[in-house]
Amino acid sequence: MTIKFLSESTINRIAAGEVIERPASVVKELVENAVDASSTKIDIVLERAGKNLIIISDDGIGMTDKELEIAVERHTTSKFDESDFLNINTFGFRGEALPSIAAISKMLITSKKRDADKAFQIKLIGGNEKQVTISVHNEGTKIEIRDLFFATPARLKFLRADKTELAATVDVVKKIALAHPKISFSLTHDGKNLLKLKGQNKDAETNLKQRIIDVIGDDFIKNAAYIDFKTPDFSICGYTSSPTYNRASSEDQFLFINNRSVKDKLLQVALRVAYQDYLARDRYPICAIFLQIDPQLVDVNVHPAKAEVRFHDPNYVRNLLIEAIKNALTNKSHVTSTTIASDALELFKNPLVNKQSPVSKVINVNSKSADYRPTTHSTLNTVPQNHVCQKLIDTLSHAKIEQEVENRIEHEQQTRKQYKLGAAKAQLHTTYIISQTEDSIVITDQHAAHERLGYEKIKDYLKTEELIKQRLLIPEIVELLNEKKADCLYDHREKLYKLGLTLEKFGEKSIIVTEIPNILGDVNVQKLIQDLADHLSDFGKNIALTELIEHVTETYACHYSIRAGRKLSADEMNALLRQMENTPLSGQCNHGRPTYIELKLKDIERLFGR
């Protein structure tokens, strides 16, 4: 076949294939154009999820008749100077969107320049039959797109159901609206209003907060930490959720570079790393984070849809984002999700109580009875007492802490005011600590709480150059489920040795352990090694040292901590609460579960109609 030039309409249809994938792509390009046009109000109207009709109206600067005629040609733009290609501050700059959309639809554009006497209109069908006429219109621009993909029926066949396409469009509008809280947005579908967002005109932080409430929800703000982080050429602001407020997917993560919504793997990995100490691997935080960076340090001209970016120094950006998120979480370190307490109160409103069953016995810290035995047998009671649990008791024997605990018992009223988690009143089911503050009741999961304390302590311990090990009097032989798990541990033996664990292969699927970290005390070695093998076997030989340390720390912390089913004295309970108050991120264990919930007295009173 002879080589020949493609026609202009064919070129535009090919370009549309890169830029326009679905109705949401059209809405994204046209709404971003409206934002670039200094609009303060943008209205979107859809029919059949945009397949039949898309209308975008704005009150921006508008266009003259000559600008209107040029705007629908390829590679025409008013948004940047050719001499300043590395300093792009607008959404659009390629000059591809309008001609690409026009090539696959029936387009009508009506526009009036600000302070102009006349409005003008241009009509295109499949990118052809361009005709500019005088029209009547308010200041700004209105673009109507009908019969999307009529000129490319093959693409039309690949569109999803209306519900799916509409959801994609709503997501696009929400992201743009989050980045521009001063602009009012409305979205209507088949006559039904789906979004109505009022523009905010206060200070930047207040504007952003209100827009996030309107788009993501007030519940998120109540359970989120505010980020405010700056360097000379970089700034990060926004909100990120407390670890206990999480999701099963990353869909609710909104990340922006210079107000441009991006799906960048570097940023997603940084977010994951920032939460690795606080969330299970199958849970994801919610966030709306905005990074402002010198345009010359980021390349947005990587992908036609501009969803991906390239940083001049990616590691620098990654490390700054991790630091910013960790700082924000640390400042909100003792706060657990408010929704957990709300859910608990909802259950109280409709209790599922068996009237035949007696109320379970509660251990009162003021009771002198020593003959209490749990009514329910727990296999955990057969596990040897952990050396670290004894350390917690030993810590209390120090004169200073002893005196502190005595003072708190003697001056309970003062304790309620002075300490966030209050004074311990009872232990429920040898698992939960009930404490009282000035205006609330706090229920603490003793295992989850001590696991967080242990996690932070062991994390610091593993950073020390000289790890103290204890040699087992009798080496422990641990038989694993299969040879793969045994090989996995053996493959990592040198790294594990540096983390305080000495082991060797013993047969096909067994490991012999000769030394363990001293901090673990009288730990159940069998269970420790089995759990560690389960953690590591999914990763094989290629796991990074940082990930290995994370897995080892989690496993150590779980075996280090006080178990459910262990009776605690008043002194031990109060000591645990005080340690929580002084430990970063003690509101959740390292799996993202809450360590305590707080029930406000006013909410409890409402349950009783007071």
Swiss-Prot record:
This entry carries the following GO cellular component terms, namely: mismatch repair complex
GO terms for biological process, alphabetical: mismatch repair
Family of this protein: Belongs to the DNA mismatch repair MutL/HexB family.
Note the superkingdom of the native organism. Bacteria
The record's section on HAMAP family has: DNA_mis_repair
Keywords, sorted A to Z: DNA damage, DNA repair
| Organism in which the protein naturally occurs | Rickettsia africae (strain ESF-5)
Q: Which NCBIfam families match?
A: mutl (TIGR00585), PRK00095.2-2 (NF000952), PRK00095.2-4 (NF000953)
Pfam families for this protein? DNA_mis_repair, HATPase_c_3, MutL_C
Q: Which molecular function terms from Gene Ontology are attached?
A: ATP binding; ATP hydrolysis activity; ATP-dependent DNA damage sensor activity; mismatched DNA binding
Q: Which InterPro entries match?
A: DNA_mismatch_repair_CS, DNA_mismatch_repair_MutL, DNA_mismatch_S5_2-like, HATPase_C_sf, MutL/Mlh/PMS, MutL/Mlh/Pms-like, MutL_C, MutL_C_dimsub
* DNA damage recorded as keyword: yes
Q: What does it do?
A: This protein is involved in the repair of mismatches in DNA. It is required for dam-dependent methyl-directed DNA mismatch repair. May act as a 'molecular matchmaker', a protein that promotes the formation of a stable complex between two or more DNA-binding proteins in an ATP-dependent manner without itself being part of a final effector complex.
SUPFAM superfamilies, per database record: ATPase domain of HSP90 chaperone/DNA topoisomerase II/histidine kinase (SSF55874), DNA mismatch repair protein MutL (SSF118116), Ribosomal protein S5 domain 2-like (SSF54211)
Q: What is the protein name given in its UniProt record?
A: DNA mismatch repair protein MutL
